[in-house]
Amino acid sequence: METKLHVNLGQNSYDIRIAPGLLADVAQGIRPVYPEGRVFVVTDEHVDALYGAKVMGSLEGAGYRPGKLVLPPGEKTKAYATMVYRAMADAKLTRKDLVLTLGGGVIGDLGGFAAATYLRGLPFVQVPTSLLAQVDSSVGGKVGVDLPEGKNLVGAFYQPKAVLIDPESLQTLPDRFFRDGMA
């Protein structure tokens, strides 16, 4: 059973879709906001091992042309903005291409910030896999990166085109991250 919530922000409005199995059918989840073209997936090593093949297979099977950047997991990754920009440049992304963030809040923040600022803004879709990202960071429109001087010192307000939440991803979440999301 699917639940759909609409975030009404005028021109920046978007839907949040919540349904078991969305990770296996992510292509159909993005189709309403991005019917065709290239999709650049930003994820981390842990999430990629769990869901990367499933998401890439869904995108390829639906005719999208996906690329992927896999980063180390953890908060320190939010300092990797230059690496994301270089990967986007190497992929020759244009303003018509979509960025898809697949992971927890760190990946959503970093990938969303890169989408907001690369070529002055690429469309992006959040696919959060942690409880905290599903209930908080993926739906607030705040994206940012860290500096050595502190967390989230550089950022933007940039709304996703959609948020796709598969509650089944919580089954692979370590207990401490589940507790973080409940707090």
Locate each region found by the language model:
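Short, basic, helix/turn surface patches
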Residues: 91-102, 151-157
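Catalytic nucleophile loop
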Residues: 108
